[in-house]
Amino acid sequence: MRTTIPVRLAERSYDVLVGPGVRAALPEVVRRLGARRAVVVSARPADWVPGTGVETLLLQARDGEPTKRLSTVEELCGEFARFGLTRSDVVVSCGGGTTTDVVGLAAALYHRGVAVVHLPTSLLAQVDASVGGKTAVNLPAGKNLVGAYWQPSAVLCDTDYLTTLPRREVLNGLGEIARCHFIGAPDLRGRSRPEQIAASVTLKAGIVAQDERDTGPRHLLNYGHTLGHALEIATGFALRHGEAVAIGTVFAGRLAGALGRLDQSGVDEHLAVVRHYGLPAALPADVDPAVLVRQMYRDKKAITGLAFVLAGPRGAELVSDVPAPVVTDVLDRMPRDSLENLVGTTEAAAP
């Protein structure tokens, strides 16, 4: 079954296709764009990308946080220029979320913007990273600190790609699906994988349509991410993004409870949802809460103090100026486990 989800924006609206075999739509997408040349940047085997129908340069990429740096973007833009890519042509990404991030930023910067089409191959990229137009790379000081908003011309979420994923990579994507439970999605537990993807994308498309530039409602998509990003950095990215967001989601429930925004049943629901998906729910034993708090002060939402997206009587919303002692106390009360056991939890969980 194929689902088409429109992302309706004031400018640069596009469709997200979800289902088996949707990558075959790529030549038609390229034709509609009027491109004469294409650069395909792929972290997957060459035969994972169908022909574009135009003269094409294939560049090999590698997924992973170490590639999310400005030097990678510079290298890609240099290859675009050597190939003679024009502003009327197209760039195609094929890979996980780090690949769509880096390629999207390169497309945003080259000639001040060239069309980009994403073929996300991981569950994480299909449910979140490839949709919405956020592109970014990391700096030593923090995650996603340099970026741009550049909407794709199409996103083709071919669910056939997911059959090749290692179990841990599936769980990585489920971390984003789990957090959707608390920001307006229906209960996705027990749904088929294509249904989970389509529901997650539909939720995100609606939020992005209201707030493309992340000045209001789009903050909701950061549920669990404030601590999640800090955990990724503190563990040297030994925790995958979805794993860290899952722990951040449990923490968000506990923090909301500590602030009187949720009763105990609401706090417990966060843990139940995360555990249902087989995701980690404890802090790594060797991570210092003080380090996490310092890192969370660097979060883009922390304008005047610590800020978190938290559940409450009116639903999830951005809560600013959260007292650091309260945050530290909640972190201190979180269960702890070794990083090896936390990663082992996701390895052993059923997809």
UniProtKB/Swiss-Prot annotation:
NAD(+) binds at residues 65-68, 97-101, 121-122, 134, 143, 161-164. Keywords: Amino-acid biosynthesis, Aromatic amino acid biosynthesis, Cobalt, Lyase, Metal-binding, NAD, Zinc. Its EC number is 4.2.3.-. It comes from the Bacteria. Belongs to the sugar phosphate cyclases superfamily. aDHQS family. The keyword Transmembrane helix does not apply. Disruption phenotype: Inactivation of the gene does not affect rifamycin production significantly. This is Putative aminodehydroquinate synthase. Transmembrane segments: none annotated. InterPro entries: Dehydroquinate_synthase, DHQS/DOIS_N, DHQS_C. It is an enzyme of class 4 (lyase). Its cofactor is NAD(+); Co(2+); Zn(2+). GO terms for molecular function: 3-dehydroquinate synthase activity; metal ion binding. May catalyze the conversion of 3,4-dideoxy-4-amino-D-arabino-heptulosonate 7-phosphate (aDAHP) to 5-deoxy-5-amino-3-dehydroquinate (aDHQ). Probably involved in the formation of 3-amino-5-hydroxybenzoic acid (AHBA), the precursor of rifamycin and related ansamycins. CDD domains: DHQS (cd08195). Zn(2+) binds at E176, H225, H241. Pfam families: DHQ_synthase, DHQS_C. The keyword Amino-acid biosynthesis applies. It comes from Amycolatopsis mediterranei (strain S699) (Nocardia mediterranei). GO terms for biological process: amino acid biosynthetic process; aromatic amino acid family biosynthetic process.
